[in-house]
Amino acid sequence: AVFYDKNDKENFRLSLVTQGYDYNLNKPAFSNPRRFSFTLGENAKIKTAKEQLQKFINTKDKSLNTLQEAFSVEPVTKEFYAKYKGLYENLSQKLSANHVALNVLNGYEGLSETKAINAFVKKLLGRIVFLYFLQKKGWLGVPKDMPYGSGDKGFLYTTFQKSKEKNVSFYATYLCPLFFESLNTKHENDYSSLFESKIPFLNGGLFEAFTKQINGRKENMESSPFICEVLDNSDFEAIFDVFESYNFTIEESTPDNTEIGIDPEMLGKVFENLIDYKSKQGLFTRHEKLCILCVKMPSRALYKSDTPPHR
């Protein structure tokens, strides 16, 4: 089935809707139309939809199972993780092979040598992915007199294209200033003269720079000329080749709602595979478990109180 919003003429949702029977209500029941769906439209990323639906078209076994597989998010998760891991390994190897980069980033997150490089690359990619979700909300590149939500939803790639046109380093000229001088620095009305638009101030720590004392001055090691020289535009071309192929959705999948794309929960799964949680004494809690906790904990609290619980 196809669903659309009359106020949004550019996008629509292609959903797999199944019919069952509700014996309690004694009537037919239909699945949530948002469950197992592709978001398509003029500016949508269609690579995943095209590949998975084409696979179903080509198969000789036309059945409900193969149709459900075409609308499954699992292949996207595995494919994205494999490509994301490839980006991580390539950048880590490139930086680790450079002795100056090893020295500059030594001490990153309290780590040394290659472990420090790995931590830097994880955070670099994590920051970029986070900004993909942020730009999807229209919070980047917002015109000066417009509200948040009206920004450029392709802000990062647009900026990267600008760096290529000007033949300048994307990392040095745009990405580092975006990280450390815009997102991590408060400006009047959030306006950035470099980007000629509003950029939100985020003080959660994700965009804090790794610094060292050099000749009595605090220097940002992440924007060091040595790191800027190693990370050239070809590295970011590879990153955007991957990220621009997928639909980033700001809605997390739930047991009843699975949009075929990259969502915050999937990002958690990616980091779970890349990061050694045991050594860091951390744990990624999956969305379905959070849903259960949100239901069970209030019920338990009410049960223990003097007031009897109500449904």
Where are the language model's segments positioned?
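Preference for the N-terminal adenyl/adenosyl cofactor-binding alpha/beta module
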Residues: 1-311
